[in-house]
Every structure is written in C-alpha cells, then in structure tokens.
Amino acid sequence: NAEIYTGQARWDDCIAACDELAKGGFALDKKWNDTFRADNDKRSTEIIWSIVYDEVYAKGMGWYQRWLHYAHQTGWDLQSGPWNGLVTQPTFYDSFADNDLRKVEGFLIGKQYPRKVDENGNYYYDTTAEPLKGSEEYNGQDLVFVNYIKSMTEGEENSGARSIKYEIQPGTTGDMNNDWVMFRYSEVIYNKAEALMRKNGGKATQEVVDMINSVRQRSFKAEDWEKAKYTTATLTMDEFLAEKGREFAFEGIRRTDLVRFNKFVTT
C-alpha cells in the first residue's frame, strides 16, 4: 500500500521481494484447507509466518467457539460450548461457485447433524442420526442454518453460514491446536500477480493468470476445473479482488486490500 500512504508506487520492489521469498523453499499445499489443519505446524509447506497455538502449552485459539451453535458441543463432541456468534455475510457466501470446495467444505449451511470420524480419520456428517436442535427461536426444532440475516440487531440463532476453515478436532477444548496463519506463500503469489497487473495497466497477462490459477485450482475437482479457471479475459482487477477475498477469507487482510483498491468506503 505504499502508493496509498506515500504517493509513490513500489510495484518493482514488491516483485523483487516476492521473488526473494520464492527462493525460501515454500510451496502451495495440495489441498486448500491443509494450511488450516490442527497439525498445520507440521503438515503445511505453505505457511511462512504463523502464531503458535497448542491446547496445553499455548492456549487461545478459539475459532469454533465464535462460529458454531450451542448444539454443536454435544453433536461434535466438543469440550467447551460454542457461542453462536459470528456468521458470514450472505452476499459473500453467494460469491463462491457452488462447486468451489472452499464453499462446500469450508462453511456450514442447511440442516445440522452430528459429526463423526471414520476408520481412516475422515470427518463425515451422520445424516442417519437425529439432527441437532435449536434452543432459542427454534427451540426443539431441527437446526437449519440459512444464508439470511434478519438484521444486524435481530439475527436469529440459525442466521448465516458458519466458517469451518480451521479444522475442528473432535474432543477439542476451547483451545485448539491449529496455528493461526498470518502470512502464507499463496499471498506472495497474489502480491506479485497484482504488481504485474498494475504495471500492465490493470490487465492480466498469461503469466498472471497462471499464477492465480495455480492457487485456485486446488479448490475445484478435476472435472470442474475447465470452467472454473481464469483467462486473460475473465481475470479483471475487480475479479482479482473478489477472488483474493474468497481465498483469504477471515485471514485479516481484507481491509488492507480494499484500501489499496480504493473500495474500503464504497458499497
């Protein structure tokens, strides 16, 4: 954001810094959510800088408490009760393609069921079991998250999609093991791509398209990729900003991006 605050663009410096970081041995994780697993300190090749958390030795990571409903405590075998607090803005949730794995796997929407773990350690929702139940406006009724918020002051207990971007382990306490991701290699790719676009009059070259697609591709199944990938015609500056919002949702960098794109105070 050098140009915003000093009046002097430093896109060449940005590109040079990104090129230096690319020499550091970092690599994109194979799956979009490997970066946010409970063992991301060991699993991820993408994380450059993170805040260390541990349920015993470095407490404070309470992602699920902020997003999940009270009923998830028993339904998901959690030792500490969620607060039913944060929800996703409906327009943002709708901005994801329906076959985008960041949407399919990264949010809770619809009827809520107990979550189980199979013999291979994979999570699944037990739709043969009794659905989780509401306890406020929908007391005793099936808990069904809807992509709708009545108002900022009168949200109902089932309002909004809930983010599960960070893995929530069964039996976890209110202090999760996931390290909080501050900066990852995919952001380096995005930063260089944006700098190249801005030096090219805001238009994407094939190099830029390939860079963004290298991050985006893991969020789609192979059979869906041909229609999902960007081209030099579809990757506009506005679409770049929108896709960066989806890729880095809830990671704390959106304000900086909106300021740089002169959209922080626009609707």
What are these regions (language model features)?
Residues 11-12, 82-86, 92-93, 205, ...:
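Generic detection of long, well-ordered alpha-helical segments
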Residues 225-236:
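Short, mixed-charge amphipathic alpha-helical segments
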Residues 27-189, 198, 264-267:
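Elongated scaffold/linker segments in the mid-to-C-terminal portions of large proteins
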Residues 25-28, 220-221:
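Helix-capping and short linker residues that terminate individual alpha-solenoid repeat units
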Residues 225-226, 255-259:
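A glycine-biased, small/acidic residue-tolerant capping/turn segment at secondary-structure junctions
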Residues 1-22, 49, 100, 179-217, ...:
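Extended, hydrophobic/aromatic-rich amphipathic alpha-helical segments that build helical scaffolds
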Residues 8, 59-63, 107, 226-227, ...:
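Short, solvent-exposed loop/turn and secondary-structure capping segments
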